[in-house]
Amino acid sequence: MSRFSSLLALVMVAVLAGCGRPEFSDAEKQTIASLALSRLPPLKPDTTNRFADVPAAAALGSTLFFDTGMSGGGTVSCSTCHKIDRQFQDDLPQAVGVGRTNRRTMPLAGVAHDPWFFWDGRRDSLWAQALTPLENPLEQAGNRAAFTHYIKARFGERYERIFGPLPDLSGVPANASPLGTDAERAAWNAMPGAQAEEVNRVFANIGKAIAAFERSIAPPQTRFDRFALDLAAGAEPKGDAAFSSEEILGLKLFIGKANCVTCHNGPRFTDVSFHNTVVPPV
Ligand code: HEC
Ligand code: HEC
């Protein structure tokens, strides 16, 4: 090592030691506080679902969420991918149901706060979202006529106490759906309109019960939330809330130069008072 470079090394050690832990500016502290779970507003009423806050609907929805009977082959439920002990996701790069999908399972903690659903936001109500995996051939691979028969046979009484009388299903084919296989679509098209309407109503109510359950899936407090709370209170974050220098520098980037916070701007995209230019409030 030359004399010059050893001197440089000494200077660098001295500079790094003198730096200590990186600090946040007041503006950064304000942004961090805005990202804390405690800033999550109370759940708004779901104006698309009359049963959203009916406890019996949520209870039935919870049964259906975990029931593998709610699939074509009887092997997959919502909870196959949305696992209760992993914030309702599965740690896989791509979700696997009846087949392998091309997307990652989204966590459901706090999902009822979202204005729209799926990675691409292609559903705008929680109950309509729930119907999609039920008929997706790679996920639950069922069809609405089969689900309607299943609900009547298995949960008829519980269903009727919430949603009123089930229709007469004697003329409804075992398998039929406007989105299914060729045979299922042909069976669906052959059904009288009023009968298709009745099946659609039961299918929609399945979604509404599941959505009522999903309103109860609250996000747990994380290390980040404890860190943000301590920081907002002017206290030195302690225990697992104490961030390492790398974590602090990463957070500075996240809310600063790297612009992540433009989109990832609060618990479930809801704190729109800061930064939010890409995902507008609804
Ligand atoms: C095969 C695995 C799998 C099954 C089964 C499954 N999901 Fe999902 N879920 C996913 C994947 C993957 C996504 C993202 C898919 C996309 O964006 O196209 C997702 C997205 C969602 C979302 C959107 C979350 C958000 O923040 O936008 C909700 C809500 C949801 N699922 C609920 C359900 C319900 C309810 C069921 C059962 C009726 C279910 N899922 C069944 C894998 C699954
Ligand atoms: C323009 C908006 C936008 C910006 C800026 C942005 N993200 Fe994202 N990010 C998204 C969206 C939308 C998704 C989910 C959709 C997808 O995967 O295509 C996502 C997904 C993610 C995921 C995956 C989450 C999961 O559960 O699989 C991570 C991690 C992530 N972003 C981190 C970051 C980081 C770190 C930055 C800054 C360097 C950043 N994002 C900047 C919009 C954004």
Model-predicted regions and their roles:
Residues 6-15:
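Bacterial N-terminal signal peptides
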